[in-house]
């Protein structure tokens, strides 16, 4: 079904090739909500009657199935409205372009996903805090250059993960704030002669503000790319953790045991415990980076203003988002069930402690360092400092000393609570604004 005017004729294969129907299935509800806001704004601005607004809103509510044969969701919805309401349904095209409409719907969908992901990261961080509380004295190795470094604890490792997640959480929250601005009312590129209140439309849709310049509003995808970029940073970090756990659970190192639900055996070798979930996560991180790369490559050569290339970016937003959603769940499950096996730390991992103790007695550190190093090379080094003693000797904030770790846990718990509260208040503000849209809609149709 071709609703909008075209030049010349169009072959079926061309319609199929340029159609965005498949990727538009992701934003059906958002497109409907944006259309409602537009119809309500036309009514509030005096361009359509209450009866026309009511009939159009009821038609929007009756649109459920996105059928093949249309160029996109916008064409399908408008055709449904006109067929349901009659000629009066054609008012939905007044003061509106698919360009500002889709840009708004994409932001609504990304906003929804980002809020979900932010809550999921909070949940994961809480898991790490609870695991840390019972792991302050469980010895755990550290590595630099993947060579044994110094003794640490499992709690120290868990809090390292939480620390990185805190940073990434704030990156993603900043993306949420950028995404939550409204393009609606910007028309195709230079606005419209129809006197619409863009700020009122933005309020009804729960946005914080409008994107002022109409060229930017209709054709920029930088805020969405920024969101995918920050989600990719989360996957980048998850991939490092996956690599840690794959190596540490291998029979060569054998320091951690992964939950049985996240390993698989071999069809031939019955002794195998393959870290299959983490291997898939590691590869899915690459898929997310591929989505980001695709966004860059599609976007980089476009002249300013809307181009249909932009619709080919949409599937990459949602692919990365869904990878992130499932990966958070996987990491959470693995970290909840991970076990540290009995293992022996090499005495030489406390060599730094020995050198520092010598320096504390008044020997210049480099001289103390060389004294210890020479004994190690000569094979005569014996440390009287146990790994457990080593961790208790650590004197700086952020180190694995259990006493300092417990203080860090309290600080992190407070920070998580503050960030969760901030997110909840922000979400409630959005919901409160959108409730006004629902109130007006109900007043019109009931």
From Swiss-Prot:
One annotated GO biological process: L-arginine biosynthetic process
Pathways involved: Amino-acid biosynthesis; L-arginine biosynthesis; L-arginine from L-ornithine and carbamoyl phosphate: step 3/3
Domain of life from the UniProt record: Archaea
Keyword presence, Lyase: yes
EC number: 4.3.2.1
GO cellular component, one term: cytosol
GO MF entries: argininosuccinate lyase activity
Matches recorded under InterPro entries: Argininosuccinate_lyase, Fumarase/histidase_N, Fumarate_lyase_fam, Fumarate_lyase_N, L-Aspartase-like
Subcellular location per the Swiss-Prot or TrEMBL entry: Cytoplasm
Pfam families reported for this sequence: Lyase_1
Primary subcellular site in the record, as a coarse category: cytoplasm
UniProt keyword list: Amino-acid biosynthesis, Arginine biosynthesis, Cytoplasm, Lyase
Catalytic reaction equation(s): 2-(N(omega)-L-arginino)succinate = fumarate + L-arginine
Keyword Lyase: yes
Family: Belongs to the lyase 1 family. Argininosuccinate lyase subfamily.
UniProt name for this protein: Argininosuccinate lyase
Lineage: Archaea, Thermoproteota, Thermoprotei, Sulfolobales, Sulfolobaceae
């Amino acid at each position: 079904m071709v609703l909008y005017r075209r030049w010349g004729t169009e072959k079926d294969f061309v319609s199929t090739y340029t159609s965005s129907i498949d990727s538009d299935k992701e934003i059906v509800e958002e497109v409907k909500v944006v259309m409602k806001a537009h119809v309500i704004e036309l009514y509030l601005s005096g361009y359509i009657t209450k009866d026309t607004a009511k009939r159009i809103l009821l038609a929007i509510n009756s649109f459920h199935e996105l059928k093949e044969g249309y160029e996109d969701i916008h064409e399908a919805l408008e055709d449904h409205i006109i067929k349901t309401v009659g000629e009066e349904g054609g008012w939905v095209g007044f003061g509106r372009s698919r360009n500002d409409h889709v840009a708004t719907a994409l932001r609504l969908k990304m906003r929804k996903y980002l809020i979900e992901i932010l809550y999921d990261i909070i949940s994961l961080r809480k898991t790490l805090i609870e695991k840390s509380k019972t792991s302050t004295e469980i010895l755990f190795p550290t590595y630099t250059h993947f060579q044994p470094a110094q003794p640490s604890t499992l709690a120290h490792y868990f809090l390292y993960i939480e620390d990185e997640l805190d940073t990434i959480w704030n990156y993603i929250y900043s993306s949420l704030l950028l995404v939550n601005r409204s393009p609606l009312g910007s028309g195709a590129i230079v606005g419209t002669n129809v006197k619409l209140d863009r700020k009122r439309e933005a309020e009804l849709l729960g946005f914080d503000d409008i994107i002022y310049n109409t060229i930017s509003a209709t054709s920029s995808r930088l805020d969405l790319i920024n969101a995918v970029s920050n989600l990719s940073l989360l996957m980048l970090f998850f991939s490092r953790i996956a690599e840690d756990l794959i190596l540490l659970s291998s029979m060569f190192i054998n320091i951690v045991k992964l939950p049985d639900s996240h390993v698989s055996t071999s069809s031939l070798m019955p002794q195998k415990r393959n870290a299959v979930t983490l291997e898939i996560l590691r590869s899915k991180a690459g898929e997310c980076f591929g989505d980001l790369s695709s966004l860059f490559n599609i976007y980089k050569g476009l002249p300013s203003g809307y181009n249909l290339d932009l619709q080919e970016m949409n599937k990459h937003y949602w692919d990365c988002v869904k990878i992130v959603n499932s990966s958070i769940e996987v990491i959470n499950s693995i970290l909840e069930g991970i076990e540290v096996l009995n293992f022996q730390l090499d005495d030489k991992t406390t060599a730094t402690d020995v050198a520092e103790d010598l320096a504390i007695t008044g020997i210049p550190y480099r001289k103390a360092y060389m004294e210890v190093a020479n004994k190690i090379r000569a094979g005569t080094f014996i440390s009287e400092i146990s790994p457990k003693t080593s961790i208790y000797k650590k004197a700086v904030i952020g180190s694995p000393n259990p006493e300092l770790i417990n203080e860090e846990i309290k600080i992190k718990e407070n920070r998580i609570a503050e960030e969760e509260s901030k997110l909840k208040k922000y979400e409630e503000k959005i919901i409160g604004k959108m409730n006004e849209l629902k109130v007006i809609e109900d007043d019109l149709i009931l």
